[in-house]
A protein has these predicted regions:
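Glycine-rich phosphate-binding loop signature in dinucleotide/nucleotide-binding domains
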Residues: 45-48, 131-136
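A short, acidic, amphipathic alpha-helical segment used as a generic capping/interface helix at domain edges
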Residues: 120-134
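Generic beta-sheet signal
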Residues: 3, 134-144
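Acidic, low-complexity terminal tails and accessory targeting/binding regions
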Residues: 77, 83-95, 151-209
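Short active-site segment of divalent metal-dependent hydrolases/proteases
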Residues: 11, 146-147
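Phosphate-handling substructures
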Residues: 27-28, 67-123, 165
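Short beta-strand scaffold positions
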Residues: 54-55, 122, 141-142
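Active-site-proximal alpha-helix that buttresses catalytic centers in soluble enzyme cores
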Residues: 2-70, 100
Length: 209
């Protein structure tokens, strides 16, 4: 069985590289984002999907509904696929958060945030893992960080440690993965996170407190 995972369609926030990790902020798709969803019919086997899953964010759910072409009463909402909580950086440029992350490390929670970058990645991976129990083939509509991590894992050189920053994942570019392969990726990534978390805080850039 196969899982198709993609980042939501383009938004005004994404074109300006602004961060939104608060699902109560109504960030919707831009006009181009809506058009891109219509074009996605040519690259996704939408007719064969049995389960549709979206994060708890409006832009992810809007993307899923546009891809179905009809109101999807059976759309599954999986909050563990949500975007990272950026805390006080909410609504600001990614560069501001990125500079803070570079200085403070992947395990430190930004002021006002409920999770660190690594804690957020773990949450997202557990969300994907849970979705593998749903009837397949399935489509998961999530956010950039999760897709960036999975694309990195797909092309990961042997022995390479998880980086602090990942290449940006394009909107609506699907990652199509056999369930057995995806399950192996998740297990490897969770193991990496466990190994990082067990290190001395000084060696991993400050533990979340």
């Amino acid at each position: 069985m196969k899982t198709h995972i993609l980042r939501h369609g383009q938004t005004e926030y994404s074109t300006k590289y602004l961060v939104n990790g608060d699902p109560s902020v109504p960030v919707q798709l831009s006009e181009e984002g809506v058009r891109s969803c219509q074009r996605a019919w040519t690259v996704l086997p939408l007719h064969s999907l049995r389960t549709w899953v979206a994060s708890g964010f409006p832009r992810a759910q809007q993307t899923a509904l546009l891809l179905t072409g009809v109101p999807a009463a059976d759309l599954v909402i999986e909050d563990r696929l949500n975007e990272l909580d950026y805390g006080e950086f909410e609504g600001g440029p990614f560069l501001g958060y990125g500079d803070w992350l570079d200085r403070r490390g992947a395990w430190r929670r930004p002021p006002g945030a409920a999770e660190s970058q690594r804690e957020g990645i773990r949450r997202m991976l557990l969300g994907v893992q849970a979705c593998l129990a749903l009837p397949g083939p399935r489509l998961l509509v999530s956010h950039g960080l999760l897709l960036s991590v999975l694309f990195w894992q797909q092309n990961r050189p042997a022995g390479e440690a998880m980086p602090l920053f990942f290449p940006e994942a394009p909107c609506l570019q699907p990652l199509d993965v056999q369930d057995a392969v995806l399950g192996g990726w998740i297990a490897d990534l969770l193991s990496d996170l466990d190994a990082e978390a067990s290190q001395d805080p000084d060696d991993r850039g400050d533990a979340a407190i």
